[in-house]
Amino acid sequence: MGCSQETRVGEKPNILFVIGGPGCGKGTQCKRIVEKFHYKSFSTGDLLRKYVKDKKEGYEEIENQMKEGKLISSATLMKVLKEYILNEENKKILVDGYPRNQENIDEWEKQMKDHVVVKGALYIEVSNDEMKKRLLGRNEGRADDNEETIGKRLETFEKETKPIVEYFERQKNLIRIDGMKTVDELSEDIANKFKEKGLA
């Protein structure tokens, strides 16, 4: 796949999931991938926060779940994702922060399998202690970034999302990256993997 954004009519979107715990640096790396390889990046978290901010239908439930560090329902996420992906002109798409559990995968398979090509999952691996330190140290004014909620988010990640890493590993399309490195080193490792896997 080249860097051109020109696509053939009817071409299926190529999807690369980006997974990792809270504070692992997914957002920063997605921005760099967009700049270097001309992907379109979509963060489920950003879209959900926008949904709440715009006070769209059912936003109260989503807002409460986010404040409590709970996962948003698969049906809610899938509705938003499907609309976004199938209407996106750029067919090289990063999905940041999804799937988060087996239910997400099942919902995706049911609704998206025939419409897209999943190229794999990029997993940025960072220790829990480091993720907690990063989250407590950043100041983005997020309601879901206090110490108690961070603990819940990390717990949820261990329980729900770690098995997703194993799922993609079994599918032989997991790209595992050491997220304990500097931002620039991490970007370089990802770029090398993209070239190696034909994702550039």
Where are these predicted regions, by residue range?
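Glycine-rich phosphate-binding loop of ATP-dependent small-molecule kinases
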Residues: 1-200
